[in-house]
Amino acid sequence: MGNSFTCISHEQEQRPKKSSGGGGNNSGKYKYVRRLSLMPSFRRRTLLPSLSCSGSSSTSSSKKGGIKAKTKKIRERHHHHHQDHEKDSHIIQEQTLAATNLLFNQTPRNSNSVVPPSFRRSTSVVYPSAQPSGTSSGPVSAVQTPKKSSAGFVRSSSSRQRSSTDPMIKPNQLVDKELNKVEGSETKRFVLVHGGGFGAWCWYKTITLLEKHGFQVDAVELTGSGVSSIDTNNITSLAHYSKPLLHFFESLKPTEKVILVGHDFGGACMSYAMEMFPTKIAKAVFISAAMLANGQSTLDLFNQQLGSNDLMQQAQIFLYANGKKNPPTAVDFDRSLLRDFLFNQSPPKDLALASVSIRPIPFAPVSEKVHVSEKNYGSIRRFYIKTMEDYAVPVLLQEAMIKLNPPEQVFQLKGSDHAPFFSRPQSLNKILVEISQIPFKKSS
């Protein structure tokens, strides 16, 4: 049999087969075929013993007796093993119960007790309170946990002790440090006005950064811009285009002031609102915006540089909703030139956002002349932020506006395209915060 263990099947076939010789000495004998199951051998053997009927019966009986004896021994061995396993499990349970009782008896049962250190998750305190005056007796001393009134917080799952180099700055001091930057500001509320074709969506980075400094920020969406349902071709005046901004100022309290910030054509809307609500505007900030003088229109301003700005001429698409015999009703942008014209320094994700969000600019407000006075418009402190890599409103055009209508102070954003809220949001935020802190100059 080799290394295989053989078991005899309970079913046996005894097929009498006649000798091929037919008669003679082999006529009274038969050959028996037995089916044997071999485990764990993977092959089946077929034995063909030539046995008589009487010999086969005695051999089969003896083998059956041997199998029964082996089966009985296996069952007895398994029964003893099961009893030993139950005995071991019972001993383990008794030992566990004894250890639990011992631990319970050694732990003090009062309200001030603490969990033994061996069962306590290790922690370290960044700002630890005063050390306990005493420790418990015994080989293991109880560790007092920090109280809620202590100036600190628990650092989870760390047993590192505090080092002398660890700063003692509390979490709330980080916020206070940021808020200290705007303590000297006259107002803590910004109002943001988007440029032509843009919407309130373009200020999402600036809003986030200013709010982190503790400012309240409002982004106004002008008529026919962003999510406005009004058709741009139907806007016929600067007052109509600026209506949401005017409504905002009307809703302010009489003594409330804001810092007004405008971009691009939003500068013309700012000038219109500054003339109407001078007492509600603490400061006005023009970001590459149309800072118009009295009697000037945005179209007049851009016509000064239109001949030298080939990219602007290529990017602009005039719309004639009333027919080409009449003036244009709106100006759209060639989407394929947006990157080169407006967003040459902006991230691709912001370019993608602008590509699906920009709308046409109403032409009537662009061609309308603005009338401002020194008493109202001139009483508001103005600041200008130049964008130094701007191809839509080139630096020369920005400087021409500054020279014609000088502000109190001029700032520069290096590396910024026409959309600094995309290309240089951190730098823009820094300048806005700085402007909010500039105090009034004392008259000599």
Curated annotation (Swiss-Prot):
It comes from the Eukaryota. Residues 1-32, 49-90, 124-176 are annotated as: Disordered. Belongs to the AB hydrolase superfamily. Methylesterase family. One of its GO terms (molecular function) is hydrolase activity. Residues 124-148 have a biased composition (Polar residues). Its main location: plastid. Keywords: Chloroplast, Hydrolase, Plastid, Transit peptide. It is an enzyme of class 3 (hydrolase). InterPro entries: AB_hydrolase_1 (IPR000073), AB_hydrolase_fold (IPR029058), MES/HNL (IPR045889). Putative methylesterase. This is Putative methylesterase 13, chloroplastic. Residues 49-64, 149-164 have a biased composition (Low complexity). Pfam families: Abhydrolase_6 (PF12697). Residues 65-82 have a biased composition (Basic residues). Residues 1-60 form a transit peptide. It comes from Arabidopsis thaliana (Mouse-ear cress). The active site is at residues 264, 390, 418. It is found in: Plastid, Chloroplast. GO terms for cellular component: chloroplast. Its EC number is 3.1.1.-. Residues 190-310 form the AB hydrolase-1 domain.
